[in-house]
Structure formats: structure tokens, C-alpha cells
């Protein structure tokens, strides 16, 4: 009987990707099958995230909830991976002696060896090292179900924003070789994948080695997109998360040259105040950010922009917050992830004095979220009556009698249709805009790409000013 593996994942899409790779590694090496029931598992893994406040305590809380399973089954192995594991290391075993494995994001490929060593020696195994790119060299071939897939193209971050733990938990930026990425994605098309999302902490900072290139010559992110665009079978290209400092003119030009590159960019700004941006060590100003957006919309008039915001960074005044609100008004965002600042141990910002009352931070966050939500809903409403090219991904979560897919600008559309449409592109007429999704009806379903110029005008039926306030981006 195959052994059972239970994985609980916290945090970002990088962690989701890593968890899938953990399952792949253990399936190949030890024939483990995933289970959704921790009580039935032979191995329980927690893939953790340390971005939010009290992340460590949440991990120990979850560990405590499975401790009784270890008491009932001494052969059960419990492991902690991800960013909290990188931060805490052997301290996890000290606080929770029933933990058998502690591993970082860069050492998940060593799980089979760690498990074997634990079973032979009886001693907990801790490996939170940062081997350069070794992880990707030892991962099994990509497997996926469905027509979409995530592919990690780089790891780590070298920006060292004052509030962020990523450089300390995932290491500095390391890029996979260009040919390795292209080979993996070409293999995914053989599994039926039509849309790929490229992953990295700062994905547009990619600088990968090229086979047969001159020594020291590296492929940048724009060149990777150019090569990826030529892979037969890949119809859509997404990526996350990008950094404004790495948004080069070549990357912006790709939105003119590459129709497969979707009309959606997630570009975290964090604040609209230059003073706060400097304190965050973000490396750009509000005006520079708006300049990127203006040039993006010139290259791709229908592009959808989403972002990240931190409210209540130490020292943020009402004037600083109002600068953020003015930026939101100017850009016209299509959604955001926004949070109240939480101090992360070991980061430069952790030592900054914070005198802003928590209630004030809550009120600011609510105002910001309401503003962005209104903008996003207005964009959704303007899509009603247009025809959208949707990749049908599967059954609707809300109604299994319907289908669900995503538009080019990342809107979820639910619509009536037959299961035979799953995995294909469909032209849908948008009939209603709900709070977080769209409703549609089928016009035509096939695999033929729609000309991007035609898609732009079908999508919105108007010029760029109907999508974003370009005149305000100065």
C-alpha cells in the first residue's frame, strides 16, 4: 500500500508551487500519494510563510493540532518547510520535539534523503541551507492536471526592502538557465497546458544563463518572454510578482510584440508617498511608478493593473496616506492585496518607531480597499456587453452545473456550458458583473487565437481612457 502524504500550504503562489514539487519529489522517490486527511497520513508537511505577523506562532499552533497523531503513531513523520523554517531552523525542534524534519525553500528536493536519514538514525533532520539552483537540478519532470501551470523561473530577492524577510528566508536572486525553463514549458504543452504563469519573488529581475552564449551573457526577462512566445501550444503567458525597479523598456515593448502576453500586470507599489517609499527602500518614486503605468498603457491600451499596498508603515502621516490615495485615483487599479504593516523580526524596519494608533491604520486600510474595490467594480461593469476570450479551466466552484474560466485580464467568468469545453478557449459575451466574478454566455468555442487588436476593441469597445485615467499619470 502506498504511503500517504498530507501537505498544508500557507502564503504565496511560490509556496503553492513548492508544495506541488514536494509531492512530486516524494511520489517519485518513495511512491507517496497525497491525502486531504492528516489522520490518514504517514508524512505531514507544513509549508510555511513568514510575511505576515505572528507567522511563527501560527505554525506552532498547527503543529500542536497534529501532535496527538504522532503520539498515536510514532512512525508518523512531521515536517516544517518554507520561510518560517528558514528563519527558525533548529529552534522549531527545540520548541516542538516531535517534529522530524525542518527544511527551507531551497532544500525541498532533499526530502527523500532527509526522511531516510531520520528513519535510520532516529534523529530530527534540519537543512535550511541555500544551495545555488541545486533544487531545480534535482526536481522530477513537471506534472500537472488541467490547462494552466505555474513554473518557477527564479528564487529569492536581492532588493532588501526594509520591511521584508524574503532575502533572509529564500536567499538572494538566483535565476534558472533559460534552456531549462523552455524545456520544462515545452514539456507542459505535451500535457495539455495552454497557459503558463512564471513565478519569482521579483520575476522580472530574471537573468538566466543561455546555452551556447558568450561567457557572461545572460537572458533578461524580456528575452525569456520572447522565446516563450514561440513555443507551440502556449497560448497565454502570465507572471508574478514583478518589481517596478526591474520594469525595463524592453519588458514594456514586449506588450507590443507578444500577443500571448496577457493584458494584466501585478505591480506592487506599496505606497504613494515618496517619503515612505524611501523609508521602505523601494528604489523608486511615485512619479516613476506612474511613468511605468503610462508607458504600459501606451503599449497595451487595455492592460489591467493590480498592486500591493502597505498601510501604517512606521512614520506614515495622514499626508503620506493621502498621497497613496491620490496615486490610486491616478492609476485606476483593477484590484489589490492590501495589509496593515506588521513588523518582521530581523528586518531594518523592525527597529523604527511606530506611533500611529492601530484604529487609525484600520480606518486607512478600509478607505483604501473601498477605493480600489470601486475602481475594480467599475471596470467589471464596463466589460458587460463585450465579448471576451476565456480559457475554460473547469467546473464553477459555486455551481458545478456551470463552467468557469478566466479572461485575458484575469477576471473569473462563470457561464453555462458542456464539459467538452473544458481546456478550450471560448468567446463569451459578458452579461453581468458581480462583486468578484463575471457572468457570461457562450458565443463560440474553439482553439483559434483571436487577433489581439480586435480583442482590444471587442473587450472594451473604447479607447484607453475607458480603462485607466492616463491623463492623470503625470
Swiss-Prot record:
CDD domains: Radical_SAM. The keyword Amino-acid biosynthesis does not apply. Residues 143-382 form the Radical SAM core domain. Its EC number is 2.8.4.3. It catalyses: N(6)-dimethylallyladenosine(37) in tRNA + (sulfur carrier)-SH + AH2 + 2 S-adenosyl-L-methionine = 2-methylsulfanyl-N(6)-dimethylallyladenosine(37) in tRNA + (sulfur carrier)-H + 5'-deoxyadenosine + L-methionine + A + S-adenosyl-L-homocysteine + 2 H(+). The keyword tRNA processing applies. Keywords: 4Fe-4S, Cytoplasm, Iron, Iron-sulfur, Metal-binding, S-adenosyl-L-methionine, Transferase, tRNA processing. Pfam families: Radical_SAM, TRAM, UPF0004. GO terms for cellular component: cytosol. [4Fe-4S] cluster 1 binds at residues 12, 49, 83. Binds 2 [4Fe-4S] clusters. One cluster is coordinated with 3 cysteines and an exchangeable S-adenosyl-L-methionine. Residues 3-120 form the MTTase N-terminal domain. It is found in: Cytoplasm. Its cofactor is [4Fe-4S] cluster. Residues 381-444 form the TRAM domain. [4Fe-4S] cluster 2 binds at residues 157, 161, 164. Belongs to the methylthiotransferase family. MiaB subfamily. PANTHER family: CDK5 REGULATORY SUBUNIT-ASSOCIATED PROTEIN 1, MITOCHONDRIAL TRNA METHYLTHIOTRANSFERASE CDK5RAP1. Monomer. NCBIfam families: miaB-methiolase, MiaB/RimO family radical SAM methylthiotransferase. Catalyzes the methylthiolation of N6-(dimethylallyl)adenosine (i(6)A), leading to the formation of 2-methylthio-N6-(dimethylallyl)adenosine (ms(2)i(6)A) at position 37 in tRNAs that read codons beginning with uridine. This is tRNA-2-methylthio-N(6)-dimethylallyladenosine synthase. It comes from Nitrosospira multiformis (strain ATCC 25196 / NCIMB 11849 / C 71).
